[in-house]
A protein has these predicted regions:
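Acidic, glycine-anchored loop motifs typical of Ca2+
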Residues: 175, 211-229, 271, 360-372, ...
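Short, compositionally biased P/S/T/A/G/V-rich stretches that sit at domain boundaries
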Residues: 405-429
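Aromatic/hydrophobic beta-strand junction motif of beta-rich domains
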Residues: 186, 425-435
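Exposed beta-strand-loop-beta-strand "reactive/processing" segments of non-cytosolic proteins
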Residues: 47-97
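Boundary/activation segment at the start of structured domains
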Residues: 137-252
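A short, surface-exposed interaction/processing loop segment used at functional sites
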Residues: 94-140
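A short, glycine/acidic-enriched catalytic loop
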Residues: 216, 221-223, 233, 248-250, ...
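Active-site-proximal C-terminal subdomain of hydrolase catalytic domains
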Residues: 180, 298-393
Length: 463
C-alpha cells in the first residue's frame, strides 16, 4: 500500500444530454445517479454514500484529517463513497465532485473520512446493506474462579483503556463493546482493582450524542450501576494519565494498555491513533509518555488501523510487549457481524474463554498463564480479515508476561545436581548448575521450542 493520503485524481467528462443543453443545474438526485453509475455493481450493495447538503462553491477547501483537498473551480456536489463500512478508518475511499452545471466528475482517492465538512454536515444518501445490531450491550460476565496462582498482588496491576472514536458519525458502538469486554476481563477474570483502571473514551462523561447510533455511550462498562468511563479521549487527558502513572508505578508494578477505534498516518508514515474531535495522537508523541513509566513490564494491545507503526517506538524499551491488529500501512477491520473488532476480539477471547481442559483457550502449555505471546498468536491465527497482526517484545518478555503478572519461576540461582537428577526450570535469568567433574549432563527442552538458548560450561570449585 502506498503511503499517500490521496493517490490520484481522475477527471471524467460526462455528457448530461438534455440537462446541459438546457443549461440547467444538476440536482442532487441526478448527481447521485452519475455517482452510482460509476460504482461496480458487485460492490454497490455494501457501499455507503454521503452527499453534501448544498452545492459547494468553487475552490472549497475540504479537510481530511491533517490534510486537505480542494473542490474544482466551479460549483459541485460532493459525494463521499465508503466501500468498506466494516473496516476501521483509515481505509480506501473515494471523494466524487460532480459539477453542478457542466456535469464534470472529479474522483479523488483517499484513505480517510472528511472532517470539514464532516459527515454530520452531509446526508447519507445510501446505506450499506450490511446489517448488524449496533446497539448490543455486552452483558456482565459471571465472575469465574481464578485458575492462576497470582504472581503479583492486585495492587500491582494497572490498566489504561483508550477509544478515541473520532466523532459521532464514525464512533461505532463496536468500540464500546471492545472496551467493555476487555474491562470486564481485567476486573472479573484477572482481579484488577477498578480504581487502577483508567478508561478514556470519546467525549468522556458528557451526555451528548457521541455514537453513530445517535445516542450517548453508556458510562457503565460492566452493568453494575457504577460509571466506568472517566475522561474524554484527548491528548491532554492521555498525557496526564501516563504522567500520573509515571510518578506512581514502580519496578514492582504491571501496566496493561488497550487502544481501539481509528488510526491514520502522516506524509512521513508516522502512525497515529484517532482521538475525539478527530484529533491525531501520533506514535512519536504517545511512545515517550509510555516509555517514561518505570513499571516492571508494560503490555500493549492496539486494534486501530496502521497500529503496527507504533512498534518501532518501543523497540528500545525492554519492558514493553506490544501486539497490533495490522502493519504500519494496513487498515484493521471489525468482525463480519460488526459487533466487535476482529483482532482484539480474539485477543480478549484468548485470555478469557475457557477450553474443555479448564484452562484459557490461549494458554497453549496450560500453565495457567496466557502470556502476551500466546494471546497474540491465538488472535493472529483466528483473525480472518485482510490484516496482518504484528508483535514485538525484547528478551523473550512476551513469553512470560501475562495479565495476571509474570509467569512464575520454579527455581533460580545456583543448583547442585546429582547424577541422574532432573529438574524443571521456567524463567529468564541465568542459572548455574554445580555438578561433579566428568559427569554427563542430559538437557531436554520440551517447551517452548522457538527460543534461543545459550549454554556455557566451565570448571571450578564451589564458592
Amino acid at each position: 500500500m502506498k503511503k499517500m493520503y490521496f493517490i490520484i485524481i481522475y477527471v471524467l467528462l460526462l455528457s448530461i444530454g438534455a440537462i446541459n443543453s438546457a443549461n440547467k443545474s444538476i440536482t442532487k438526485l441526478e448527481a447521485y445517479n452519475i455517482v452510482i453509475s460509476g460504482i461496480d455493481s458487485t460492490t454497490l450493495d455494501s457501499t455507503e454514500i454521503f452527499v453534501s447538503k448544498q452545492i459547494l462553491p468553487a475552490n472549497t477547501v475540504i479537510e481530511i484529517g491533517d490534510k486537505s483537498i480542494e473542490s474544482p473551480d466551479y460549483g459541485s456536489w460532493m459525494f463521499f463513497i465508503n466501500k468498506y463500512p466494516l473496516s476501521n478508518w483509515g481505509h480506501s475511499c473515494n471523494y466524487m465532485l460532480i459539477g453542478s452545471n457542466n456535469g464534470e466528475v472529479d474522483i479523488i482517492e483517499s484513505n480517510f473520512y472528511p472532517t470539514k465538512p464532516s459527515l454530520a454536515d452531509m446526508d447519507k444518501i445510501k446505506s450499506s446493506v450490511v446489517t448488524f445490531d449496533e446497539s448490543v450491550f455486552v452483558k456482565p460476565m459471571a465472575r469465574p474462579q481464578l485458575l492462576q496462582t497470582k504472581a503479583t498482588y492486585d495492587s500491582n496491576k494497572y490498566a489504561v483503556i483508550i477509544s478515541g472514536g473520532g466523532n459521532p458519525s464514525v464512533n461505532y458502538p463496536r468500540y464500546w463493546n471492545d472496551c467493555s469486554s476487555i474491562y470486564q476481563t481485567l476486573l472479573y477474570t484477572y482481579n484488577y482493582d477498578s480504581a487502577h483502571i483508567t478508561v478514556i473514551m470519546s467525549d468522556g462523561t458528557s451526555s451528548n450524542i457521541d455514537r453513530s447510533t445517535g445516542d450517548s455511550s453508556p458510562l457503565d462498562l460492566d452493568g453494575n450501576g457504577t460509571n466506568d468511563i472517566q475522561f474524554a479521549a484527548t491528548s491532554n487527558n492521555i498525557k496526564t494519565t501516563f504522567s500520573n502513572l509515571a510518578s506512581r508505578l514502580t519496578s514492582n508494578d504491571y501496566l496493561f494498555i488497550f487502544t481501539i477505534d481509528h488510526g491514520n498516518y502522516d506524509s512521513s508514515g508516522n502512525s497515529s491513533l484517532t482521538l475525539w474531535n478527530d484529533e491525531n495522537l501520533y506514535a512519536s508523541t504517545f511512545a515517550p509518555w509510555v516509555n517514561a513509566i518505570n513499571a516492571k513490564a508494560i503490555n500493549i494491545v492496539m486494534g486501530q488501523c496502521f497500529s503496527g507503526g507504533f512498534i518501532s517506538y518501543f523497540k528500545n524499551n525492554p519492558k514493553v510487549s506490544i501486539s497490533t491488529a495490522s502493519t504500519k500501512d494496513q487498515p484493521s477491520s471489525s468482525m463480519s457481524d460488526g459487533r466487535y473488532d476482529e483482532f482484539v476480539y480474539y485477543w480478549t477471547e484468548a485470555v478469557t474463554k475457557k477450553a474443555s481442559s479448564g484452562y484459557m483457550v490461549g494458554d497453549v502449555n496450560q500453565d495457567a498463564f496466557t502470556t502476551a505471546h500466546e494471546a497474540y498468536d491465538y488472535a493472529r491465527t483466528h483473525d480472518k480479515k485482510n490484516e496482518d497482526p504484528q508483535h514485538y517484545s525484547s528478551d523473550l518478555l512476551s513469553h512470560f508476561l501475562a495479565l495476571n503478572g509474570m509467569r512464575a519461576r520454579t527455581t533460580s540461582g545456583t543448583i547442585a545436581v546429582e547424577r541422574g537428577e532432573t529438574f524443571n526450570y521456567s524463567g529468564m535469568e541465568t542459572i548455574n548448575w554445580t555438578i561433579p567433574l566428568n559427569s554427563p549432563v542430559n538437557i531436554s527442552i520440551k517447551f517452548p521450542t522457538n527460543i534461543v538458548y545459550k549454554w556455557n560450561c566451565s570448571s571450578g570449585n564451589p564458592g
